[in-house]
Amino acid sequence: LILQEYIPGDDNCMRVLNAYCGLDHKVKLMALGRPLLEEQTPEGIGNYAAILSDPEYNDAALLEKLKNFLEDMQWEGFANMDIKYDARTGEYKMFEMNPRQGRSSYFVTAAGYNLSKWLVEDVLEHKELGLTIADTKSLWMIAPYGVIKKYLKDPDLLARADKLKKEGKCAHQLFCKEDWNLKRWLWYIRSQLNYYRKTARYYGNKGLRD
């Protein structure tokens, strides 16, 4: 049994960090995303439905602390961290760290930083790599934008997401025109429509009761 302090706050109080540490145990890449909305279903709890990348949210003190944490452990490879901002104390609380890429880690590639590039250049090409901190703006999503627009309650974040979508600086996890065929198209439409149904059903309790 693991007991964890309850940290109040909406889904957008979360932060997600994806990092890569080289064979020399030094951090080579850090990409901090701000989730806009999480999955709401029982089986989806803990997964993100939309993530905003914006250098304005790159908290320098937080990134430095996480960098030192990884290097002090002599970490090697990928690290995926879930963190939440506690408005009561003004501090960030780490929930967990996974030794792998996360389900939503494509948000890093969507921002222009392909995680695999750092792995290949470090392990296979033996390049000397410094620290890169992702600093571009982009919107990653797996849910349809209509769901995000309806359930994201923060007007400032919604305005930022709207702007990125209008500028074409967004990526959808499941949309890949090179893979397109009729069967996939029908599955994709069904999957996206289902987000409206299941989010309406579980929003506010995340499947803890029906």
Q: At which residue positions do the language-model features occur?
A:
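Secondary-structure boundary/capping residues
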Residues: 78, 106, 128-129
